[in-house]
């Protein structure tokens, strides 16, 4: 697990944290207009930040379960679309982790799609190749204001894996996560 520390300005006392995951850009069922609207809504708020939690694209490889030809764009075109779609969030990304769709490409070809996207968006230093523990410091701690200390919040980030389509698998994954945190 990677530790990521984000120190926000002391004058920022309150933030919103939004999670974007499983949008599967390039999947025929992806609501790209809905994704773009959500990104615009987040970008319009001065105190809004985002966690990119994997499966931003719908990449398939020759050996993956999904059909490599069912996506609408090539892997490179999907990366470019992700960079364009999430560009308004540049400077607002607290953390980025890959999902299983990005990990497929890394395992097959050694190309880390999530890092490429995060780096292009100015958040390469806030990328974790697996799980991340993100410490976000902001505002001033009311009990330690005279010392100039900020209040720090911790956020555990992981795309998750497995579980499939059955409820039993999802329950087992939640039990696994309960052992971690």
Kindly label every feature range from the protein language model.
Residues 48, 95, 119-181:
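His/acidic metal-ligating clusters that form di-metal
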Residues 4-128:
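Core catalytic region of metal-dependent phosphoesterases/phosphodiesterases
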């Amino acid at each position: 697990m990677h530790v990521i520390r984000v120190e926000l300005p002391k004058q920022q006392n309150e933030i919103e944290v939004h999670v974007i995951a499983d949008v599967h850009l390039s999947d025929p069922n992806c609501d790209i207009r809905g994704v773009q609207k959500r990104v615009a809504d987040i970008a319009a708020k001065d105190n809004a930040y985002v966690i990119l939690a994997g499966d931003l694209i719908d990449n398939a490889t020759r050996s993956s379960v999904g059909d490599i030809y069912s996506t609408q764009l090539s892997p490179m075109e999907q990366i470019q679309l992700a960079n364009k779609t999430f560009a308004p969030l540049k400077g607002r990304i607290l953390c980025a982790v890959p999902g299983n769709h990005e990990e497929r490409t890394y395992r097959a070809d050694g190309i880390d799609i999530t890092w490429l996207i995060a780096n292009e968006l100015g958040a390469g230093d806030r990328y974790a190749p697996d799980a991340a523990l993100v410490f976000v410091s902001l505002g001033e701690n009311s009990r330690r204001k005279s010392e100039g200390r900020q209040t720090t919040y911790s956020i555990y980030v992981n795309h998750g894996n497995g579980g499939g389509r059955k409820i039993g698998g999802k329950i087992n994954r939640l039990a696994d996560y309960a052992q971690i945190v």
